[in-house]
Swiss-Prot record:
Gene expressing this chain: ausH
Note in the entry: In A.calidoustus, the austinoid gene cluster lies on a contiguous DNA region, while clusters from E.nidulans and P.brasilianum are split in their respective genomes. Genetic rearrangements provoked variability among the clusters and E.nidulans produces the least number of austionoid derivatives with the end products austinol and dehydroaustinol, while P.brasilianum can produce until acetoxydehydroaustin, and A.calidoustus produces the highest number of identified derivatives.
Subunit structure: Homodimer.
Its job: Part of the gene cluster that mediates the biosynthesis of calidodehydroaustin, a fungal meroterpenoid. The first step of the pathway is the synthesis of 3,5-dimethylorsellinic acid by the polyketide synthase ausA. 3,5-dimethylorsellinic acid is then prenylated by the polyprenyl transferase ausN. Further epoxidation by the FAD-dependent monooxygenase ausM and cyclization by the probable terpene cyclase ausL lead to the formation of protoaustinoid A.
Pathway the protein contributes to: Secondary metabolite biosynthesis; terpenoid biosynthesis
One annotated GO biological process: terpenoid biosynthetic process
Family per similarity comment: Belongs to the trt14 isomerase family.
The name this protein goes by in its record: Austinoid biosynthesis cluster protein H
Amino acid sequence: MPPTREELVSTALNFIAQFAKLDVDSVLSFLSPNCTLRSFPSSLGKPALQTKEESKADFQGLKDFFQNFQLRVKDGSEPVVDEPARRVVLHIEGKGDSLVGRFETEYIYILRMNEEGTMVEDFFQFADSATRDAWGKKIEAHFSARN
């Protein structure tokens, strides 16, 4: 039996909750063995992560960089669910303290679940480009100053 809307939303929200904790193993437990993570827009130049090991390194980098990290569905937005395609679209707010100061941004996450609706098979992340560009410069300056 295909997953229900409620099951798909539950998996998506649980994934976001674990992502916000930056508990790498918990985040990875929600990813199917063949999960692909993609960041958009393409102009950000971030390659797709094709394996759990690549994803693990990426999530570990976030954990090392952020403190008090928060991810949540933006107030006033509701998940958009395509049950036959097993997709959930979320408007996410991200906040936290980092090595280079306070971080606040928005994302659109498109999560496609496995046939059971229990794991993420594809994770598409659309980032706020203006914030990402500004942060890229701050991060670059931070690490340049350390070298």
